[in-house]
A protein has these predicted regions:
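Bacterial Sec-dependent N-terminal signal peptides
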Residues: 1-24
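Start-of-domain marker
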Residues: 22-88, 99-101
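Acidic/His-rich structured neighborhood in mature extracellular/periplasmic domains
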Residues: 88-151
Length: 151
């Protein structure tokens, strides 16, 4: 009996790892070429927060293995600080998918949005709800993420 419980526990442990795999393998880069007023540490924190938001969230009900995750990159260029914690930026998103039965990837989506305004307070969690609009930052990231997943 104890052996069966141990085997059942191990089986559940190993299958749970597969179910936790998320859909994206996102790389986030934030540039601030013309910005001189804001503290540069804020943007490093923002970069890490966005990467965590994109890579750890379960966007669909589908189960993806690690090698099946969609490679994508978000290049965010902060162009100006409009007010405290309010920024104007541009974003370039590119998503790649593996070509079936080959060893290379192909670009599926490549888009640039030149006018994006959002608010970000350092160390404040990025909150998102599918049924409610909570912020310009997470709303825009989720919008482009769903496009990348849907293609």
């Amino acid at each position: 009996m104890k052996r069966n419980i141990g085997i059942l526990f191990l089986l559940m442990l190993f299958t749970t790892g597969k179910l936790l795999a998320q859909e994206l393998n996102a790389k986030v880069v934030i540039q601030t070429p013309r910005l001189q007023l804001a503290d540069p540490k804020i943007f490093k924190t923002l970069e890490n927060d966005i990467a965590e938001f994109l890579n750890t969230r379960k966007w669909t009900n589908d189960v993806f293995q690690t090698q099946e995750r969609i490679d994508c990159s978000f290049l965010i260029t902060i162009t100006e600080e409009l007010a405290a914690n309010r920024f104007n930026a541009s974003i370039v998103l590119q998503s790649n998918r593996p070509v079936y039965n080959s060893s290379y990837n192909t670009v599926m989506f490549n888009y640039q949005d030149k006018n994006w305004t959002f608010e970000y307070t350092e160390f404040q969690p990025l909150e998102y709800n599918d049924n409610a609009y909570l912020s310009e930052l997470t709303g825009m990231l989720a919008y482009y993420t769903y496009i990348a997943i849907g293609l």
